[in-house]
Amino acid sequence: MKARIDAIIQRNQAEYLEQLIPQTDLLLREMEEYGGEHGVPSADREVALFCEITARAANATRCLEIGMAIGYTSLHLARAVGEDGLVVTIDPSDEMIKAAEGYLTRAGLRERVRIERGKRWTLFRSSKILLI
């Protein structure tokens, strides 16, 4: 669970919930450690898993992610959309994009993710997007 417990749940509740979450694979664990060591803003394991489960439940074949960082949530979403699906993700940082491409390639999911370099509003200036 998170390093600090939210005010919503107590420590023993958090520990119980932690036991319900499947063990993460080695690549995801490496990404978590890298993110922690380098101060990379990233979703918690619980949040990324929630995104994956939600995408699967919705039978989503296309997902949009804004702010990819090292690709932690992108990887979860790419698993969810399946072989013919696509995750479009946006990040302004060349450093983060390079790291994410490496992790996604190692996971065998790079072809499911289209990475756009830029800031969210400049990429969608002409689009009429209502909800992301």
Where are these regions (language model features)?
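N-terminal auxiliary segments of SAM/dcSAM-dependent transferases
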Residues: 1-23
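Homeobox/homeodomain signature
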Residues: 7, 32-33, 114
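Short N-terminal amphipathic alpha-helix/helix-capping patch enriched in small hydrophobics
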Residues: 13, 27, 47-50
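Amphipathic alpha-helical segments within well-ordered protein domains
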Residues: 14-18, 32, 101
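S-adenosyl-L-methionine
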Residues: 21-33, 40-41
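S-adenosylmethionine/decaboxylated-SAM
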Residues: 36-37, 41, 45-132
